[in-house]
């Protein structure tokens, strides 16, 4: 990164959690700009996060701003959009969030931004494609969060069956971040052993289904998912 400056668009639970994670990990980031369609929400989050700097492991400049501040940002993280509600699939959000996205991307590009977009907003795969389309940036400059969250859930679930630390499990969900995602069992291992030799097929199938539906279960219970993605 040239300026070590990141903009987070959307200061709801996910956006705020990403900002919080950045100031609590020793990263290369030295400036965070928060922006939201509700300007005073971004201002309030910036004020709250600045107070945390007194006890954070490193100093990061934090401010609220507008899309114009994207001009010299290295990365713009897109978290803005309607949140998934109980009973909704990620694809149910498409029309609402696609409409929000286009105007947002156009304003960011008007600032002169030429960095990298990191897209978190659901349905993430489609929103990542639309960000590339609306921005005109090459594919290597528009990145989705992918199945990194799903893979973390997979490792945790496998670890619970094998009674090991999730960090010692190497396993991946692939494909869409959504209902068609798949578990790459052939590469899953822990401690040098293939998971397929330790867990029967019916258990593995149950784990795959559990991981695929985990988001719906969490949303039914607490409405929002904010803990894992900011850390990964």
What are these regions (language model features)?
Residues 90-155:
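Rossmann-like NAD(P)(H) cofactor-binding subdomain of soluble oxidoreductases
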Residues 20-24, 51, 106, 133, ...:
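Short, well-ordered alpha-helices that flank and scaffold nucleotide-derived cofactor binding pockets
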Residues 80-82:
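Conserved NAD(P)H cofactor-binding loop of Rossmann-fold oxidoreductase domains
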Residues 1-43:
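NAD(P)+-binding Rossmann beta1-loop-alpha1 motif at the extreme N-terminus of oxidoreductases
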Residues 14-19, 86, 124-129:
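Short glycine/serine/threonine-rich phosphate/pyrophosphate-binding segments
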Residues 31, 35-72, 88:
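Conserved N-terminal Rossmann-fold NAD(P) cofactor-binding segment
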Residues 135-141, 150-232:
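C-terminal substrate-binding/catalytic lobe of Rossmann-fold NAD(P)-dependent dehydrogenases
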Residues 74-77:
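N-terminal Rossmann-like NAD(P) cofactor-binding module of classical short-chain dehydrogenase/reductase
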């Amino acid at each position: 990164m040239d300026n070590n400056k990141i903009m987070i668009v959307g200061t709801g639970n996910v956006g705020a959690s990403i900002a919080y994670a950045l100031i609590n990990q020793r990263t290369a980031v030295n400036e965070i700009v928060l922006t939201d369609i509700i300007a005073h929400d971004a201002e309030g989050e910036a004020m709250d996060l600045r107070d945390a700097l007194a006890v954070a492991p490193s100093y990061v400049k934090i401010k609220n701003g507008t899309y114009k501040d994207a001009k010299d940002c290295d990365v713009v993280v897109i978290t803005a959009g309607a949140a998934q509600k109980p009973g909704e699939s990620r694809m149910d959000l498409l029309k609402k969030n696609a409409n929000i996205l286009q105007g947002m991307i156009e304003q960011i590009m008007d600032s002169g931004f030429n960095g990298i977009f990191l897209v978190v907003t659901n349905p993430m795969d489609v929103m990542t494609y639309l960000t590339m389309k609306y921005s005109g940036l090459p594919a290597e400059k528009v990145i989705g969060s992918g199945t990194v969250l799903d893979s973390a859930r997979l490792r945790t679930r496998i670890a619970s069956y094998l009674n090991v630390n999730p960090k010692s499990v190497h396993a991946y969900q692939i494909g869409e971040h959504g209902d068609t995602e798949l578990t790459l069992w052939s590469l899953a291992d822990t401690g040098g052993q293939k998971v397929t030799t330790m867990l029967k097929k019916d258990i593995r199938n149950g784990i795959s289904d559990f991981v695929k539906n985990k988001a719906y279960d969490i949303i039914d219970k607490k409405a929002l998912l904010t803990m894992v993605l900011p850390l990964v």
